[in-house]
């Protein structure tokens, strides 16, 4: 099959593209920064032109882009997306109901939600990894024989895999730069106290999300005085969903990750790989 992949800065693409190719499929890649996930006339025209030049079986993306869905519907081409974020705000758009879409969601709750809305082609598919790549990475007789190349300021240096080994490692974002910290300065004392309590409660609950249900109509009315909801005309997301996800959700994740790392580091050596203040994701730091 001929597959056109729209690629953004998601780590999943390396394994996915390699897997497509290992199955004998032809993969072409398009990369272009979007003005909006929902509407971008320049990108839509560019994508339309590419799809006219070659007979593609489907377009693939990690996560969902309504603008791509719209073009695929016009061209009569299948659009396949596999989510890696939850909730995926870009899916709360009228284009999810187009026939061209084929959704694979890693979060079963979101899968059930959109299936219940009447989305036609949708399946639950957990996240995956290219096991062949990892098996090859660790196939050497000893870790010392394996070398990883790291580019730093244009100079390539070699590191043994042993340099990156550790009993406990965290790879990811600490979200120490989040919109809540800026908004908090403008919130009245009541809202600050309310949100602090909601986030603390969420941190003590495993397997459930209480943040959005705690955003009552009264609370959201107060929030609207300080937080502007920006969305396209065809989006059906609302203030509660967006604020719970992009503001309180990221702040809660930041608190949870930092507290867990500090608690672990108090008793054990912990390796942290992140793109936040202490350095780039390729850097290794002791917590």
PLM feature spans:
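Short, charged, surface-exposed secondary-structure boundary motifs
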Residues: 38-40, 88-95, 113-117, 133-138
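Short, polar loop motifs at secondary-structure junctions
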Residues: 9-11, 63-67, 86-88, 106-111, ...
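Short, structured coil segments at secondary-structure junctions
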Residues: 23, 75-76, 98-99, 117-120
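N-terminal pre-catalytic "stem/leader" segment of glycosyltransferase-like enzymes
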Residues: 1-75, 240-257, 269-272
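A conserved, positively charged/aromatic
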Residues: 92-104
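Active-site proximal beta-strand in glycosyltransferases
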Residues: 72-87, 102-105, 124-127, 169
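A short, active-site helix/loop in glycosyltransferases that binds the activated sugar's phosphate group
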Residues: 103-121, 131, 259
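Nucleotide-sugar donor-binding catalytic core of glycosyltransferases
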Residues: 2-12, 120-121, 126-146, 154, ...
């Amino acid at each position: 099959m001929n597959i056109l992949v729209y690629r953004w800065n998601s780590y999943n693409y390396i394994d996915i593209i390699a897997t497509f190719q290992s199955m004998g499929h032809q993969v072409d890649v398009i990369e272009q920064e979007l003005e909006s996930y929902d509407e971008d006339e320049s990108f839509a025209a560019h994508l339309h032109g590419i799809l006219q030049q070659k007979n593609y079986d489907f377009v693939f993306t990690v996560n969902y882009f309504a603008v791509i869905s719209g073009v695929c519907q016009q061209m009569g081409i299948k659009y396949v997306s596999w989510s890696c974020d939850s909730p995926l705000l870009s899916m709360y758009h009228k284009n999810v109901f187009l026939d061209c879409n084929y959704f694979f969601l890693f979060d079963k709750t979101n899968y059930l939600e959109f299936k219940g809305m009447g989305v036609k082609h949708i399946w639950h598919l957990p996240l995956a990894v290219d096991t062949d790549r990892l098996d090859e990475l660790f196939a050497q007789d000893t870790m010392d024989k394996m070398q990883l190349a790291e580019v730093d300021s244009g100079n390539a240096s070699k590191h043994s895999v042993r340099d990156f080994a550790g009993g406990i490692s965290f790879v990811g974002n600490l979200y120490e730069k989040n919109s809540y910290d800026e908004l908090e300065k403008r919130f009245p004392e009541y809202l600050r106290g309310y949100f602090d309590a909601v986030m603390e409660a969420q941190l003590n609950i495993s397997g459930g999300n209480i943040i959005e249900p705690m955003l009552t109509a009264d609370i959201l009315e107060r929030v609207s005085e300080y937080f502007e909801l920006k969305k396209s005309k065809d989006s059906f997301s609302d203030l509660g969903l967006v604020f719970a996800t992009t503001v309180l959700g990221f702040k809660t994740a930041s608190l949870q990750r930092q507290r867990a790392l500090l608690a672990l580091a108090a008793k054990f050596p912990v390796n942290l790989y992140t793109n936040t203040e202490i350095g780039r994701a390729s850097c290794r730091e002791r917590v």
